[in-house]
């Protein structure tokens, strides 16, 4: 019995040792769609000040407005400026998501800069029954992903994965992660930054 137990432990150890260093280190592929890629998308990877051309390609004018407001918010936090660019020379593009991209109950989805097939795309359901404020908070959240942020387990963070309420912040964890990727305009990483719709 002892030999069987030892053999099982050795087999388990061998199988663990043959796995990649970390599942998190494995590259994951971004979703794709029938959209032209943004040719300047790698501007989003710069640590230096960024100048982002943004293509607003949505059929929903309210979403377009709130997305612009969300970009203005990020321009106060990260050392970046943005301008509209309707060409493929954009760095980021807001598109109307298809059912293949936005599964049931998913309102928006961003691509991740570090994943394969990154094209600079953020997809929204233009018919989602959201208020202006909900479009704004969701846009801030999705742009945050493009700037290097992951989901945050704190319900107070705008990067929380579910049900944004309107009193969210960028917390110390969010700001610290942002500072690893980009120059920031905020004075302190310890002071939460309120995400308030203008």
Predicted regions and their residues:
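Bacterial N-terminal signal peptides that target proteins for export
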Residues: 1-10
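Disordered inhibitory propeptide/activation segment of secreted metzincin zinc metalloprotease zymogens
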Residues: 13, 18-63, 109-113, 184-192, ...
């Amino acid at each position: 019995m002892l030999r069987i137990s030892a053999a099982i432990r050795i087999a388990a150890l061998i199988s663990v040792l043959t796995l990649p260093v970390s599942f998190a280190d494995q590259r994951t592929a971004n979703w794709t769609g029938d959209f032209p890629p943004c040719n300047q998308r790698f501007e989003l990877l710069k640590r230096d000040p960024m100048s982002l051309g943004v293509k607003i390609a949505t059929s929903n004018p309210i979403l377009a407005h709130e997305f612009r407001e969300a970009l203005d918010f990020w321009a106060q936090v990260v050392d970046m400026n943005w301008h509209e660019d309707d060409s493929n020379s954009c760095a980021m593009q807001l598109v109307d998501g298809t059912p293949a991209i936005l599964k049931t109950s998913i309102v928006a989805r961003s691509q991740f800069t570090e994943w394969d097939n990154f094209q600079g795309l953020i997809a929204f359901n233009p018919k989602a029954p959201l208020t202006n404020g909900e479009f704004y908070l969701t846009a801030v959240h999705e742009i945050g992903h493009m700037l290097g942020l992951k989901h945050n387990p704190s319900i107070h963070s705008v990067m929380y994965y579910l049900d944004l309420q309107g009193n969210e912040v960028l917390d110390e964890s969010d700001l610290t992660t942002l500072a690893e990727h980009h120059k920031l305009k905020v004075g302190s990483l310890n002071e939460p930054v309120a995400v308030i719709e203008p």
